Each structure stands twice: as C-alpha cells, then as structure tokens.
C-alpha cells in the first residue's frame, strides 16, 4: 500500500483485518514526513509490514519517519528509483516507491521457496504469514542508521541454491 493517512479509515482497517485473517501479506509505506511525524496509517498497524525508504546502499533516505525503538524498521530501495513518466525517464523517491520493492523482494523469496524448497504444508503456510516473512526479512537485514536494511544479497550473493534452501528452512524451523 503506497499511501498513508494520519487518521483512521474504517474501510481500509476492515479490509486489512480481512486480508490479515486470510493470511495475506500486506506492506505499507511508512510516511514521507521525516522526523516531523510518526508512521502513517495503515503502516502503524501490527497486521502490515511497514516499509521505510533508503538509497541503493542502505543509507537512510531522509523522508522516512524516525525508526521506532523495539520495533522492526525495514527499509528498502526508495531513493532515486528509476521510473517512466510521460514517456521520460525520471527518478522518484519516497516510501511509496520502497513499498513495492519490498513486496517484490518478498515475492522472490516465496517463489524461490515454492520451486526449490521441499516445504511441508505447515512450513509453506508459516512462510506466507506476516510473522514468517518478518523472520525472512530479518535474516536478510542489517542494522543501518537505526533501520533494518533489507538486502536480498545477504541471502543470495555467492550462495548456492542449497545454501539458500537451508537458510529458509532454518528460519522456518525457528517459527
């Protein structure tokens, strides 16, 4: 969800609750107000995965709200994202650009697991739940500037498929 509000929205909240109960993974943009305001809604919800923005090296983007203590503060590429607008190449920044990057990263992990891992039904179900994917993102993250920089390279770079399969299985064994 590449949007956010300061106030509650009953319809959006109801949709999030329904999706969460159906074990759908939900990602929400943190906010672009920097340290001036907290996370927006729905990113404040404990039923979504809140996403902050960073540059391609994991450096904070300046637009994300301050990281919350004792909370996961995932950040993905959301600064100077190459885009097309009115037939021209432009570079856009914001947590609303970081959020689909996080969703795509999650989709890549899930597809890899579906095709390469010999998962039990229980493990597959756990991987597709918020808590399971949070564990995967934590395994792919490093602390940087108070944020949890999600870098798929931490899981894949220089590793064989067997190594990645083992990493995913180890994560699932801890759930």
Question: Predicted segments — roles?
Answer:
Residues 1-11, 117-118:
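Short acidic, glycine-rich surface-loop motifs adjacent to enzyme active sites
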Residues 1-2, 27-31, 51-52:
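Active-site neighborhood of phospho(di)ester-bond hydrolases with catalytic His/Asp-centered motifs
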Residues 5-6, 18-21, 111, 136:
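Low-complexity, intrinsically disordered flanking regions
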Residues 5-8, 31-35, 55-57:
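Short beta->alpha connector loops
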Residues 8-29, 37, 41, 47:
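Catalytic-core regions built around general acid/base machinery
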Residues 24, 38-114:
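Extracellular S/T/G-rich loop segment that most often corresponds to the catalytic His/Ser-adjacent loop
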Residues 79-155:
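Hydrolase catalytic cores
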Residues 145-175:
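C-terminal domain-closing interface element
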């Amino acid at each position: 969800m590449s949007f956010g509000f300061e106030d509650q929205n009953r319809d959006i909240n109801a949709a999030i609750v329904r999706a969460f109960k159906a074990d759908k993974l939900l990602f929400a943009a943190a906010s672009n107000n920097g340290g001036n305001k907290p996370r927006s809604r729905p990113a404040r919800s404990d039923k979504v995965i809140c996403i902050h923005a960073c540059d391609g090296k994991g450096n904070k983007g300046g637009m994300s709200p301050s990281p919350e203590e004792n909370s996961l503060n995932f950040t993905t590429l959301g600064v100077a994202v190459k885009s097309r607008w009115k037939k021209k190449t432009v570079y856009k920044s914001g947590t609303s650009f970081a959020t689909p990057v996080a969703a795509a990263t999650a989709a890549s992990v899930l597809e890899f697991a579906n095709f390469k891992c010999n998962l039990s039904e229980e493990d597959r179900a756990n991987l597709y739940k918020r808590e399971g994917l949070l564990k995967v993102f934590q395994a792919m993250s490093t602390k940087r500037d108070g944020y949890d920089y999600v870098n798929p390279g931490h899981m894949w770079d220089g590793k064989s498929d067997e190594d990645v399969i083992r990493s995913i299985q180890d994560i699932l064994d801890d759930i």
